[in-house]
UniProtKB/Swiss-Prot annotation:
Membrane topology summary: Multi-pass membrane protein
Biased composition annotated in UniProt, kind: Basic and acidic residues: 1-28
Cell compartments where the protein resides: Membrane; Cell membrane; Cytoplasm, Perinuclear region; Endoplasmic reticulum
Transmembrane segments: 58-78, 88-107, 117-137, 148-168, 205-225, 234-254, 263-283, 309-329
Function: Transmembrane protein mainly expressed in brain astrocytes that may play a role in transport across the blood-brain and brain-cerebrospinal fluid barriers. Regulates the response of astrocytes to hypo-osmosis by promoting calcium influx. May function as regulatory protein of membrane protein complexes such as ion channels.
Taxonomic superkingdom: Eukaryota
Residue numbers of Phosphoserine PTMs: S183, S185, S188
GO molecular function: identical protein binding; protein-containing complex binding
Entries under InterPro entries matching the protein: Membrane_MLC1
UniProt region (Disordered), positions on chain: 1-43
Subunit and partners: Interacts with ATP1B1. Part of a complex containing ATP1B1, TRPV4, AQP4 and HEPACAM.
Name of the protein in its database record: Membrane protein MLC1
Keywords: Cell membrane, Cytoplasm, Endoplasmic reticulum, Membrane, Phosphoprotein, Transmembrane, Transmembrane helix
Length: 382
C-alpha cells in the first residue's frame, strides 16, 4: 500500500462515527488476541433484584418471618405473665427467633439460599416439638394447674409454622438457579468478586469467646447464690452456653484462617444447631426482665443482685445467639454467591499471597498508543 493510500485510510477512519470505530478495531484484531464478549444485557452494574429472584419465595419468606415474630412475641409475653406455669412457651418462642431472622435475611438477599438453612429449621422444629412434649408431660402430671387456652393455640401455631418452613426448605431446590447461572456468570464475573468474610468471622469468634467465658463465670456465681438452689434451670442453661459457644467460636476462627468447602459446611451446621439452643435459653431466662422491672416500681428500689445477674446472663445469651445466627447467614451468603458465579476455590489449601513481581492478567485488551496518537494527529490536522 502506498503512502497516499495509507493517509486516505486514516482520513476515512477519522470520518467514521465513534461507535463504528470500535467495531472496526474489534474486527481487525489478531485471532490470537483475547477480547471479552460482552453484551449490553450482560452488564449488571446496578442490581436491584438478587439473582435467581422468585416473587413467590420472597413473599413466603417475608410472610413466614412476620408470622414467626408476631407469634413469638405473644408467646413470650404470655410466658412471662405466668412464669412458672408456661416456661415451655417461652422456650418455644425463643427458639423460633433465629428462623424469623433468617427468613427476613433470605428475602432481602437471595431467595435461593433457603435450602442451606435447613439444619437451622430442623433444629428449631425439634425444640418446638420438645416444648410440646414438655407441655403434655406437665398436663399429665398436674392437670388442674394448667389452663388449656391461648397457650396451647400459640404452641401449636409455632409448631405448624416451623413444620411448614421445614417442608418448604426441603422441597426447595437450586436447579432453576443452576439453569440461569450460565447467563449470569458469563458476562458479570469480571465485575463481581466473591470474597470470604474472614475479618467478620474472626471478630465474631473473639466476641463469642469473651461472652462465653463471662457467661460461664456468671453462671457459677449464680449457682452459688442461695436463691438459685431451689431451681435447676440455671445449671441447664449454663451448660448449654458452655457447649454451644466454644465449638462455634473455634470453628469460626479456623474457617477464617483457612477457608475451605468442608470447613464452611461444618461452620454452617454448628451455627445452625447452636443458635436455636441459645435463643431457647434466653427465652427461658426472659422472666428476669419482668423481675427487674418490678424492682423499680417501688421507691426506693429493692435491687436484688440475683435478678440483675440473671438479666446480664440473658443479654449474654442474646449476644451469643445473634452472633451464631449472623455467622450462619454470612457463610450461606458466601456459599450461594460462589456457586452462582462459578467461583473456583481450592478446598484443600489456605489462601496464599501473590508474589511481589507477579502481575495479575486482566481480560481487557492492551491499549494501542500508536493508533491513538495517529488518530489525535489527524483530528488536529483537520
Amino acid at each position: 500500500m502506498t503512502r497516499e493510500g495509507q493517509f486516505r485510510e486514516e482520513l476515512g477512519y477519522d470520518r467514521m462515527p465513534t461507535l463504528e470505530r470500535g467495531r472496526q478495531d474489534a474486527g481487525r484484531q489478531d485471532p490470537g488476541s483475547y477480547t471479552p464478549d460482552s453484551k449490553p444485557k450482560d452488564l449488571q452494574l446496578s442490581k436491584r433484584l438478587p439473582p435467581c429472584f422468585s416473587y413467590k419465595t420472597w413473599v413466603f419468606s417475608v410472610l413466614m418471618g412476620s408470622c414467626l415474630l408476631v407469634t413469638s412475641g405473644f408467646s413470650l409475653y404470655l410466658g412471662n405473665v405466668f412464669p412458672s406455669e408456661m416456661d415451655y412457651l417461652r422456650c418455644a418462642a425463643g427458639s423460633c427467633i433465629p428462623s424469623a431472622i433468617v427468613s427476613f435475611a433470605v428475602g432481602r438477599r437471595n431467595v435461593s439460599a433457603i435450602p442451606n438453612f435447613q439444619i437451622l429449621f430442623v433444629s428449631t422444629f425439634a425444640v418446638t416439638t420438645t416444648c410440646l412434649i414438655w407441655f403434655g408431660c406437665k398436663l399429665i402430671l398436674n392437670p388442674s394447674a394448667i389452663n388449656i387456652n391461648f397457650n396451647l393455640i400459640l404452641l401449636l401455631l409455632l409448631e405448624l409454622l416451623m413444620a411448614a418452613t421445614v417442608i418448604i426448605s426441603a422441597r426447595s431446590s437450586e436447579e432453576p438457579c443452576k439453569k440461569k447461572k450460565g447467563s449470569i456468570s458469563d458476562g458479570s464475573n469480571i465485575l463481581d468478586e466473591v470474597t470470604f468474610p474472614a475479618r467478620v468471622l474472626k471478630s465474631y469468634s473473639v466476641v463469642e469467646v469473651i461472652a462465653g467465658v463471662s457467661a460461664v463465670l456468671g453462671g457459677v456465681i449464680a449457682l452459688n447464690v442461695e436463691e438459685a438452689v431451689s431451681g435447676p434451670h440455671l445449671s441447664v442453661t449454663f451448660f448449654w452456653i458452655l457447649v454451644a459457644c466454644f465449638p462455634s467460636a473455634i470453628a469460626s476462627h479456623v474457617t477464617a484462617e483457612c477457608p475451605s468447602k468442608c470447613l464452611v459446611e461444618v461452620l454452617i451446621a454448628i451455627s445452625s444447631l447452636t443458635s436455636p439452643l441459645l435463643f431457647t435459653a434466653s427465652g427461658y431466662l426472659s422472666f428476669s426482665v419482668m423481675r427487674v422491672v418490678e424492682i423499680f416500681k417501688d421507691y426506693p428500689p429493692a435491687i436484688k443482685s440475683y435478678d440483675v445477674l440473671l438479666l446480664l446472663l440473658l443479654l449474654l445469651l442474646l449476644l451469643q445467639g445473634g452472633l451464631n445466627t449472623g455467622t450462619a447467614i454470612q457463610c450461606v451468603s458466601f456459599k450461594v454467591s460462589a456457586r452462582l458465579q462459578a467461583a473456583s476455590w481450592d478446598p484443600q489449601s489456605c489462601p496464599q499471597e501473590r508474589p511481589a513481581g507477579e502481575v495479575v492478567r486482566g481480560p481487557l485488551k492492551e491499549f494501542d498508543k500508536e493508533k491513538a496518537w495517529r488518530a489525535v494527529v489527524v483530528q488536529m490536522a483537520q
